[in-house]
Amino acid sequence: MTLKRFFILKAILTAAGAAWLVQAAAPCTLALASGRATANGRPMMWKNRDTSDPNNKLMFLKGPKNDFAALVISEDAAGTEVWGGMNAAGFAIMNSQADDLGDAARKLDGSGNGAFMKLALGECATVREFEALLVREKGRWDLATNFGVIDAEGGACFFETRRDSFVKFDAADPRVAPFGTIVRTNFAFTSPDPMRGGGFDRFERIGRLVDAARPLGRLDARFILQTAARDLANDKIHSDPLARPLAVDPAAPLYVHTSDTINRNSSVSAILFEGAPSRGQGYLSTMWVILGQPVAGAAVPVWPAAGKVPAPTTGPQTAPLNDLALAVAAYLYPDQRGRMYQYLNVDRLRTYGGEGVLAKVLRVEDRAMERAAAKRTEWAAKKPSPAEMADFQESVAIEAYEALKKEFAEIVGRAVPAR
């Protein structure tokens, strides 16, 4: 199956009134944009990660050619599998599982996806090098995934990848991405079976959000992290709990079912990558990370050129920022009977402490973004040392962690995060 099916589906979507172009994968939600679509002219990509293991952290790993910051499952002490990351050259990769690219008859289900991303971060500096890696390794790995990659040269592409083949979707190609944006959830356009896959509701929702933000010049890190990543709307049932009135009776609070929203009950982290402003400034490539469910945690910046990750984002076992977010999430999902864990208490999200959990989280995150923006302007004029970058990102992460602990002292003091 080639791009033929892609263009057929694209025509169907356009006829249905979709002015955006999207592709897909497994419960994660992803978006990618070329520099012509973003507010600052830098390529950008983002992933809400969904998985059954709530414990995520960052690690700084060394590769044969590049060192890199990586999102891993906390129990993976050696960092053998990576679920998103960026290296010191400014190359970043993310993915989402695409079961419809697997092969059940040959028992191929994408078990090599995470290890392959680790390989790519250690070896590749550009999108071109990643494509060459896919060619070199074809047939050697169990892959069933949608890889998203950007680089310091402005490249921004998705690769629908299976064991024996891949198809490239370039955000710079007007046939593929007429507005420079591509999004994905749980299915692949090059799948041989159009009825397999999932995440179609999130696919449509994130497409609408991106399509609305782009022409207004709002497609930036703040919009993606604070609006898209934390979105709780379900367009199919016309539900938007952040916009509707709260319950009048405190004994009957408003809840939202979060299995089909972008911010899901299974969302365990969010990562956003901003490419370099120019080819010679790869050191300014930035990785933002929210450890924990996006509505329960705040994003902090990481620069792989710093040569390390901030202490609150990592640890010998779990990461402090992730532990704190788990406690907040437990407060937002108070009913754990049966499948009731899928329901988020909107009243708590919007009213805790007089202003709500989300408002408190965003205030902490705004401070981190303001500090990062000022420092990047300074660094663009004069390249900093790795030590200076490391010290700064450490101070931002520590400030955010301490602020969150203060804001949610009551919650953290009484809640034990589920393991």
Where do the protein language model's features map onto the residues?
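Sec/Tat signal peptide C-region and signal peptidase I cleavage site
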Residues: 21-27
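C-terminal, well-structured catalytic/ligand-binding subdomain of enzymes
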Residues: 29-79, 84-85, 95-122, 145, ...
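Sec/Tat-exported extracytoplasmic proteins
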Residues: 35, 124-125, 137-138
